[in-house]
A protein has these predicted regions:
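Cleavable N-terminal signal peptides
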Residues: 8-9, 19
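Anionic, Ser/Thr-rich low-complexity intrinsically disordered regions
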Residues: 2, 21-99
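Short N-terminal leader segment in a subset of presequences, especially plant chloroplast
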Residues: 9-11, 31
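N-terminal signal peptide c-region/cleavage motif recognized by signal peptidases
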Residues: 14-18
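Bacterial N-terminal signal peptides that target proteins for export
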Residues: 1-8
Length: 99
């Protein structure tokens, strides 16, 4: 069952990073955002483009986490936390993350 969560979480992360002027990968590489253990990204830089990206990515993640939580009868915070732990663990060396 956990593999199912992780697959859905991975899909949420992928879809939430598509079709942005600044992509999530670009923002991470530039040190503009970082993953957090709570499953959401946090801004490192405070410019308008970065803040918009953070807002959009986190909104998309919230929707996907809620879908996973609803379909598995668990709390959204638990889904987000599992995703956050995975995303931080998978972050390439040099990427920013917050505890």
């Amino acid at each position: 069952m956990k593999k199912r969560y992780l697959g859905l979480i991975g899909a949420a992360w992928l879809f939430s990073s598509m079709a942005m002027a600044l992509t999530l990968d670009e923002a991470k590489q530039q040190g503009r955002v970082g993953e957090t253990l709570n499953g959401y990204i946090a801004p490192v830089k405070q410019d308008a483009e970065t803040l918009t990206l953070v807002k959009n990515i986190n909104a998309g993640r919230t929707e996907k986490y809620q879908q996973v939580a609803d379909s598995n009868h668990i709390a959204i915070d638990d889904v987000a936390r599992m995703a956050g732990q995975k995303l931080v663990a998978r972050a390439p060396r040099g990427n920013t993350y917050a505890a």
